[in-house]
Amino acid sequence: MILVDISNSVTKIGLFKEGELRLLEKIPTAQISFEQTERIAQMYPLEDLILCSVVPQKNLFFEKPFLGRLYQIDPTVPLGIPIHYPNPREIGADRLANAVALSLLYGYPAVAIDFGTATTFDIVDQKGAFCGGIIAPGLSMMTSYLHEKTALLPLVEIKEPSKVIAQSTEEALRVGAVHGYRGMVQYLIEKIKEELGLLQKFIVVATGGGSRLVCSQLKSVDVIDEMLTLKGIRLIGEILIKRKRKDLPFPEGYPPMKGESFPFSLFTHNQ
């Protein structure tokens, strides 16, 4: 099974086969071409493709080469967990995949924090259902916006600051971005716990490009899993393939990947 995660900045392509998930390649989303997707289709002529996209205009690059063997994730398909949300169609496919992986692989209550162009917090409640979340500007947007909207502030590389009290403009911007972002993440985690009425710690899983930089110094983050979204895409994909091929057993390796174990049930979005 080929797994595709089209985000605003980067598209990740993974392969799940014989119980193992591996990342095949990363492509800047703006540079996706038919040449690339047709090459992948020819390399894996028997594999189904599960598409998770938040950039609809890029879907065609996969739909044509994988015609007849493509499954797309959206809020109308069975996901494996309940969705408690007034208008599920508003939820991005990547957020759904993160919630599914979070609930089925890590347990609940829990929150997945995905650091990308935007940073999303997706919450799974005490019963394992997706119950909502938070969307914040991504870390890189903080520095790029200041650079674009001011006359003198430079565009800086985002990396770990050497100290908090900066002695240059570049370092001051870096401190504000990195440490300020950590403060936002920590505060929102505490507010989520408070709103859920949790007196004890719950599971926090971070993913996405900025997850290691931001979360490496946050004790409230339990796991950094850079493959979380692909894992969720894979779990939903198994459900979609099974429903289409009702006469076939689940493929080898399903439900768990190696080292995983979780209960399985089919839920639609309105349960």
Swiss-Prot record:
Main location: cytoplasm
Cofactor(s) the protein requires to work: NH4(+); K(+)
Pfam hit, one: Pan_kinase
Protein's cellular compartments: Cytoplasm
Transferase among keywords: yes
GO CC annotation: cytoplasm
Keyword entries, A-Z: ATP-binding, Coenzyme A biosynthesis, Cytoplasm, Kinase, Metal-binding, Nucleotide-binding, Potassium, Transferase
Cofactor binding remark: A monovalent cation. Ammonium or potassium.
Residues holding substrate: Y85, G92, A93, D94, R95, T169
Keyword match Kinase: yes
Active site: residue positions: D94 (proton acceptor)
Function: Catalyzes the phosphorylation of pantothenate (Pan), the first step in CoA biosynthesis.
Family: Belongs to the type III pantothenate kinase family.
PANTHER family xref list: TYPE III PANTOTHENATE KINASE
Name listed for the protein in its UniProt record: Type III pantothenate kinase
Species name: Methylacidiphilum infernorum (isolate V4)
The organism's taxonomic lineage, starting at the top: Bacteria, Pseudomonadati, Verrucomicrobiota, Methylacidiphilae, Methylacidiphilales
Gene: coaX
